[in-house]
Amino acid sequence: ERKVSRRNRFRDSRFFMRTVPVNAERAYQVEIGIDWKVALNDWLEGRNKVVAITSASFQIDLNIPVIKIPDGEAGKSAEVLLQVWRELGQYELNRGDLIIAVGGGTVTDLAGFAAASWMRGIDWVAIPTTIAGMVDAAVGGKTGINSEHGKNLIGAFHSPLSVLIDLSWIKTLSERDVAAGMAEVVKCGFISDGNILDLLKNKSLKDVCNDEKLQLELIHKAVSVKAAIVSTDFKESFLREILNYGHTLGHAIEKHSHFDIRHGEAVAIGMCFIAELSAIKGILSPALVERHYEILKALKLPISYEKLAFPDLLTYMALDKKSKNGQIRFVAISDI
Protein backbone atom coordinates (compact mmCIF):
# COMPACT_ATOMS: atom_id res chain seq x y z
CA GLU A 1 0.00 0.00 0.00
CA ARG A 2 1.39 3.39 -1.03
CA LYS A 3 2.17 5.84 1.71
CA VAL A 4 3.09 9.50 1.24
CA SER A 5 6.64 10.37 2.28
CA ARG A 6 6.58 12.31 5.55
CA ARG A 7 9.18 14.69 4.09
CA ASN A 8 6.77 15.61 1.28
CA ARG A 9 4.07 16.39 3.82
CA PHE A 10 5.99 19.39 5.17
CA ARG A 11 4.59 22.73 4.09
CA ASP A 12 7.88 24.49 4.86
CA SER A 13 11.25 22.74 5.08
CA ARG A 14 12.51 25.26 7.65
CA PHE A 15 10.25 23.68 10.25
CA PHE A 16 9.85 20.13 11.48
CA MET A 17 6.39 18.72 11.34
CA ARG A 18 4.94 18.16 14.81
CA THR A 19 2.70 15.22 15.63
CA VAL A 20 0.54 15.12 18.75
CA PRO A 21 -1.18 11.83 19.70
CA VAL A 22 -4.70 11.85 21.12
CA ASN A 23 -5.55 8.66 23.01
CA ALA A 24 -9.31 8.97 23.23
CA GLU A 25 -11.93 6.28 22.62
CA ARG A 26 -10.24 5.96 19.24
CA ALA A 27 -6.57 6.96 19.08
CA TYR A 28 -5.58 9.41 16.36
CA GLN A 29 -2.92 11.99 15.60
CA VAL A 30 -2.90 15.72 15.09
CA GLU A 31 -0.36 16.58 12.39
CA ILE A 32 0.91 20.17 12.54
CA GLY A 33 2.89 21.92 9.81
CA ILE A 34 1.89 19.68 6.93
CA ASP A 35 0.62 20.32 3.39
CA TRP A 36 -3.00 19.33 3.96
CA LYS A 37 -3.68 18.16 0.41
CA VAL A 38 -0.67 15.84 0.39
CA ALA A 39 -1.48 14.47 3.85
CA LEU A 40 -5.13 13.98 2.93
CA ASN A 41 -4.18 11.53 0.17
CA ASP A 42 -3.44 8.88 2.79
CA TRP A 43 -7.07 8.98 3.94
CA LEU A 44 -8.61 9.04 0.47
CA GLU A 45 -7.00 5.80 -0.68
CA GLY A 46 -9.33 2.83 -0.73
CA ARG A 47 -12.47 4.89 -0.07
CA ASN A 48 -15.43 4.31 -2.33
CA LYS A 49 -17.01 7.70 -1.63
CA VAL A 50 -15.71 10.85 0.03
CA VAL A 51 -17.70 14.04 0.64
CA ALA A 52 -16.30 17.35 1.88
CA ILE A 53 -18.24 19.77 4.08
CA THR A 54 -17.18 23.42 4.14
CA SER A 55 -18.66 26.90 4.56
CA ALA A 56 -20.53 28.78 1.83
CA SER A 57 -17.82 31.38 1.20
CA PHE A 58 -14.97 28.88 1.21
CA GLN A 59 -13.40 27.56 -2.00
CA ILE A 60 -11.54 24.24 -1.99
CA ASP A 61 -9.98 22.52 -4.96
CA LEU A 62 -10.83 18.86 -4.41
CA ASN A 63 -12.15 16.43 -6.97
CA ILE A 64 -14.94 15.20 -4.66
CA PRO A 65 -18.51 16.34 -3.92
CA VAL A 66 -18.71 19.36 -1.60
CA ILE A 67 -21.59 20.22 0.76
CA LYS A 68 -21.75 23.93 1.63
CA ILE A 69 -23.14 25.20 4.92
CA PRO A 70 -23.78 28.82 6.01
CA ASP A 71 -20.83 30.82 7.33
CA GLY A 72 -20.33 31.27 11.06
CA GLU A 73 -22.63 30.09 13.82
CA ALA A 74 -25.56 30.04 11.38
CA GLY A 75 -24.03 26.82 10.08
CA LYS A 76 -24.55 25.04 13.42
CA SER A 77 -28.31 24.57 13.43
CA ALA A 78 -30.70 21.63 13.26
CA GLU A 79 -32.01 22.93 9.95
CA VAL A 80 -28.53 22.93 8.41
CA LEU A 81 -27.80 19.47 9.80
CA LEU A 82 -31.04 18.17 8.28
CA GLN A 83 -30.00 19.52 4.88
CA VAL A 84 -26.55 17.91 5.25
CA TRP A 85 -28.23 14.57 6.03
CA ARG A 86 -30.33 14.94 2.88
CA GLU A 87 -27.23 15.51 0.76
CA LEU A 88 -25.35 12.62 2.37
CA GLY A 89 -28.33 10.46 1.45
CA GLN A 90 -28.27 11.73 -2.12
CA TYR A 91 -24.58 10.81 -2.35
CA GLU A 92 -25.44 7.41 -0.84
CA LEU A 93 -22.66 7.48 1.77
CA ASN A 94 -22.36 4.31 3.80
CA ARG A 95 -20.28 3.21 6.78
CA GLY A 96 -17.18 2.57 4.70
CA ASP A 97 -17.16 6.10 3.30
CA LEU A 98 -15.58 9.32 4.57
CA ILE A 99 -16.50 12.92 5.42
CA ILE A 100 -13.83 15.63 5.14
CA ALA A 101 -14.42 18.79 7.21
CA VAL A 102 -12.55 21.81 5.81
CA GLY A 103 -13.12 25.07 7.64
CA GLY A 104 -13.29 26.77 11.01
CA GLY A 105 -14.71 25.47 14.25
CA THR A 106 -18.34 25.71 13.17
CA VAL A 107 -17.61 23.52 10.14
CA THR A 108 -15.74 20.86 12.10
CA ASP A 109 -18.43 20.88 14.82
CA LEU A 110 -21.26 20.41 12.32
CA ALA A 111 -19.42 18.00 10.02
CA GLY A 112 -18.25 15.90 12.95
CA PHE A 113 -21.81 15.65 14.26
CA ALA A 114 -23.05 14.72 10.79
CA ALA A 115 -20.43 11.95 10.73
CA ALA A 116 -21.39 10.84 14.26
CA SER A 117 -25.08 10.60 13.44
CA TRP A 118 -25.03 9.32 9.86
CA MET A 119 -25.52 5.55 9.95
CA ARG A 120 -24.72 5.79 13.69
CA GLY A 121 -21.17 6.87 12.93
CA ILE A 122 -18.92 7.06 9.88
CA ASP A 123 -15.29 8.17 9.59
CA TRP A 124 -14.26 11.78 9.20
CA VAL A 125 -11.08 13.84 8.92
CA ALA A 126 -10.76 17.39 10.27
CA ILE A 127 -8.86 20.05 8.33
CA PRO A 128 -9.21 23.21 10.45
CA THR A 129 -8.54 26.51 8.69
CA THR A 130 -8.69 28.87 11.69
CA ILE A 131 -6.54 29.03 14.81
CA ALA A 132 -9.59 28.37 17.00
CA GLY A 133 -10.34 25.30 14.93
CA MET A 134 -6.74 24.10 15.05
CA VAL A 135 -6.26 24.27 18.81
CA ASP A 136 -9.80 23.71 20.06
CA ALA A 137 -12.79 22.72 17.93
CA ALA A 138 -11.12 20.08 15.76
CA VAL A 139 -9.25 18.36 18.61
CA GLY A 140 -10.99 16.23 21.21
CA GLY A 141 -13.93 14.61 19.47
CA LYS A 142 -16.63 17.05 20.60
CA THR A 143 -19.13 17.63 17.80
CA GLY A 144 -22.47 19.35 17.78
CA ILE A 145 -24.88 22.13 16.96
CA ASN A 146 -26.55 25.01 18.75
CA SER A 147 -30.19 25.21 19.81
CA GLU A 148 -32.52 28.08 20.64
CA HIS A 149 -31.62 27.50 24.30
CA GLY A 150 -27.86 27.81 23.99
CA LYS A 151 -24.60 26.92 22.32
CA ASN A 152 -23.41 23.33 21.74
CA LEU A 153 -26.33 21.79 23.65
CA ILE A 154 -26.91 19.06 21.04
CA GLY A 155 -24.03 16.85 20.01
CA ALA A 156 -21.94 13.74 20.36
CA PHE A 157 -18.40 12.64 21.11
CA HIS A 158 -16.99 11.30 17.83
CA SER A 159 -13.24 11.44 17.19
CA PRO A 160 -11.88 12.05 13.69
CA LEU A 161 -9.43 9.69 12.00
CA SER A 162 -6.92 12.54 11.96
CA VAL A 163 -6.58 16.30 12.32
CA LEU A 164 -4.45 17.90 9.59
CA ILE A 165 -3.16 21.37 10.50
CA ASP A 166 -1.65 23.35 7.63
CA LEU A 167 -0.29 26.61 9.04
CA SER A 168 -0.51 28.32 5.66
CA TRP A 169 -4.23 28.82 6.34
CA ILE A 170 -3.29 31.45 8.95
CA LYS A 171 -2.15 33.81 6.17
CA THR A 172 -5.73 33.88 4.88
CA LEU A 173 -7.20 35.07 8.20
CA SER A 174 -8.00 38.64 9.21
CA GLU A 175 -6.26 40.09 12.25
CA ARG A 176 -9.56 39.84 14.11
CA ASP A 177 -9.83 36.12 13.40
CA VAL A 178 -6.21 35.51 14.39
CA ALA A 179 -6.84 37.33 17.67
CA ALA A 180 -10.04 35.37 18.32
CA GLY A 181 -8.20 32.10 17.80
CA MET A 182 -5.36 33.18 20.04
CA ALA A 183 -7.79 33.47 22.96
CA GLU A 184 -7.99 29.66 23.00
CA VAL A 185 -4.19 29.44 22.88
CA VAL A 186 -3.90 31.85 25.82
CA LYS A 187 -6.49 29.80 27.71
CA CYS A 188 -4.24 26.75 27.39
CA GLY A 189 -1.42 28.81 28.84
CA PHE A 190 -3.42 29.79 31.91
CA ILE A 191 -4.89 26.36 32.62
CA SER A 192 -1.85 24.18 31.96
CA ASP A 193 1.29 25.40 30.18
CA GLY A 194 2.82 28.66 31.35
CA ASN A 195 5.41 28.39 28.56
CA ILE A 196 2.68 29.56 26.19
CA LEU A 197 2.36 32.78 28.17
CA ASP A 198 6.15 33.16 28.19
CA LEU A 199 6.22 32.86 24.39
CA LEU A 200 3.66 35.67 24.19
CA LYS A 201 5.54 37.99 26.55
CA ASN A 202 6.08 41.37 24.83
CA LYS A 203 4.47 40.00 21.65
CA SER A 204 1.83 41.92 19.73
CA LEU A 205 -0.94 40.63 17.51
CA LYS A 206 1.13 41.65 14.50
CA ASP A 207 4.02 39.51 15.77
CA VAL A 208 1.72 36.49 15.93
CA CYS A 209 0.36 37.17 12.44
CA ASN A 210 3.81 37.44 10.88
CA ASP A 211 6.02 34.99 12.80
CA GLU A 212 5.48 31.48 11.40
CA LYS A 213 7.89 29.88 13.85
CA LEU A 214 5.98 31.44 16.75
CA GLN A 215 2.71 30.18 15.26
CA LEU A 216 4.09 26.64 15.09
CA GLU A 217 5.30 26.69 18.70
CA LEU A 218 2.09 28.19 20.08
CA ILE A 219 -0.24 25.87 18.19
CA HIS A 220 1.85 22.80 19.01
CA LYS A 221 1.84 23.64 22.72
CA ALA A 222 -1.89 24.44 22.81
CA VAL A 223 -2.81 21.25 20.94
CA SER A 224 -0.58 19.27 23.31
CA VAL A 225 -2.44 20.71 26.32
CA LYS A 226 -5.83 19.76 24.94
CA ALA A 227 -4.67 16.33 23.73
CA ALA A 228 -3.29 15.44 27.17
CA ILE A 229 -6.52 16.47 28.90
CA VAL A 230 -8.80 14.75 26.38
CA SER A 231 -6.73 11.56 26.56
CA THR A 232 -7.34 11.47 30.32
CA ASP A 233 -11.01 12.49 30.33
CA PHE A 234 -12.60 12.04 26.92
CA LYS A 235 -16.24 12.57 27.92
CA GLU A 236 -15.75 15.54 30.25
CA SER A 237 -16.54 13.80 33.51
CA PHE A 238 -13.97 15.73 35.54
CA LEU A 239 -10.61 17.08 34.26
CA ARG A 240 -11.79 18.07 30.78
CA GLU A 241 -14.04 20.72 32.27
CA ILE A 242 -10.91 22.84 32.77
CA LEU A 243 -10.93 23.45 29.01
CA ASN A 244 -14.05 25.55 29.62
CA TYR A 245 -12.06 28.26 31.39
CA GLY A 246 -13.72 31.53 30.37
CA HIS A 247 -16.45 29.70 28.45
CA THR A 248 -19.41 29.91 30.85
CA LEU A 249 -19.71 33.67 30.51
CA GLY A 250 -18.19 33.50 27.03
CA HIS A 251 -20.98 31.37 25.58
CA ALA A 252 -23.57 33.64 27.20
CA ILE A 253 -21.96 36.72 25.63
CA GLU A 254 -21.95 35.06 22.21
CA LYS A 255 -25.67 34.34 22.48
CA HIS A 256 -26.48 37.81 23.84
CA SER A 257 -24.59 39.46 20.97
CA HIS A 258 -26.38 37.23 18.44
CA PHE A 259 -22.91 35.89 17.64
CA ASP A 260 -21.62 39.27 16.44
CA ILE A 261 -18.86 38.73 19.00
CA ARG A 262 -16.45 35.97 17.96
CA HIS A 263 -16.12 32.90 20.19
CA GLY A 264 -12.54 33.77 21.13
CA GLU A 265 -13.44 37.38 21.90
CA ALA A 266 -16.18 36.21 24.24
CA VAL A 267 -13.84 33.69 25.90
CA ALA A 268 -11.28 36.47 26.47
CA ILE A 269 -13.91 38.49 28.35
CA GLY A 270 -14.95 35.36 30.23
CA MET A 271 -11.38 34.68 31.35
CA CYS A 272 -10.98 38.22 32.67
CA PHE A 273 -14.29 37.95 34.52
CA ILE A 274 -13.45 34.67 36.26
CA ALA A 275 -9.91 35.88 37.01
CA GLU A 276 -11.37 38.91 38.80
CA LEU A 277 -13.89 36.70 40.60
CA SER A 278 -11.10 34.34 41.65
CA ALA A 279 -9.11 37.25 43.04
CA ILE A 280 -12.14 38.42 45.04
CA LYS A 281 -12.46 34.89 46.44
CA GLY A 282 -8.77 35.00 47.38
CA ILE A 283 -7.64 32.10 45.18
CA LEU A 284 -5.83 34.06 42.43
CA SER A 285 -3.20 36.73 42.90
CA PRO A 286 -3.70 40.27 41.55
CA ALA A 287 -0.51 39.79 39.53
CA LEU A 288 -2.03 36.89 37.60
CA VAL A 289 -5.23 38.86 37.04
CA GLU A 290 -3.13 41.65 35.57
CA ARG A 291 -1.31 39.13 33.39
CA HIS A 292 -4.66 38.20 31.83
CA TYR A 293 -5.24 41.83 30.87
CA GLU A 294 -1.70 42.39 29.57
CA ILE A 295 -1.66 39.40 27.24
CA LEU A 296 -5.22 39.75 25.97
CA LYS A 297 -4.94 43.50 25.34
CA ALA A 298 -1.66 42.97 23.47
CA LEU A 299 -3.58 40.60 21.19
CA LYS A 300 -6.29 43.24 20.68
CA LEU A 301 -8.91 41.13 22.42
CA PRO A 302 -11.82 42.64 24.40
CA ILE A 303 -11.66 42.41 28.18
CA SER A 304 -15.13 43.65 29.20
CA TYR A 305 -18.77 43.62 28.12
CA GLU A 306 -21.79 45.87 28.63
CA LYS A 307 -22.85 45.88 32.29
CA LEU A 308 -26.56 46.25 31.55
CA ALA A 309 -26.54 42.84 29.87
CA PHE A 310 -25.68 40.97 33.06
CA PRO A 311 -29.25 39.89 34.00
CA ASP A 312 -29.66 38.34 30.54
CA LEU A 313 -26.22 36.74 30.79
CA LEU A 314 -27.17 35.13 34.10
CA THR A 315 -30.22 33.58 32.42
CA TYR A 316 -28.09 32.19 29.60
CA MET A 317 -25.43 30.90 32.00
CA ALA A 318 -28.06 28.99 33.97
CA LEU A 319 -28.61 26.90 30.82
CA ASP A 320 -24.90 26.19 30.40
CA LYS A 321 -24.21 22.45 30.22
CA LYS A 322 -21.83 22.71 33.19
CA SER A 323 -24.63 23.94 35.47
CA LYS A 324 -25.81 21.44 38.08
CA ASN A 325 -28.89 21.50 40.30
CA GLY A 326 -29.72 24.99 39.11
CA GLN A 327 -26.31 26.35 40.12
CA ILE A 328 -24.09 28.20 37.64
CA ARG A 329 -20.61 26.67 37.72
CA PHE A 330 -17.41 28.40 36.58
CA VAL A 331 -13.99 26.94 35.89
CA ALA A 332 -11.43 28.90 37.92
CA ILE A 333 -7.65 28.75 38.33
CA SER A 334 -5.52 29.44 41.39
CA ASP A 335 -2.08 29.46 39.75
CA ILE A 336 -0.27 28.64 36.51
Question: Where would I find each of the regions flagged by the language model?
Answer:
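ATP/NTP phosphate-donor binding region
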Residues: F16-L98
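Short glycine/serine/threonine-rich phosphate/pyrophosphate-binding segments
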Residues: T106-F113, M134-V135, A252
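A glycine/threonine-rich phosphate-anchoring loop and its flanking beta-alpha core
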Residues: F113-K206
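C-terminal charged capping/lid subdomain of soluble metabolic enzymes
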Residues: A183-V185, I283-D335
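Oxyanion-binding "anion nests"
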Residues: S204, V208-S257
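Small-residue-rich helix-loop
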Residues: V267-I269, F273
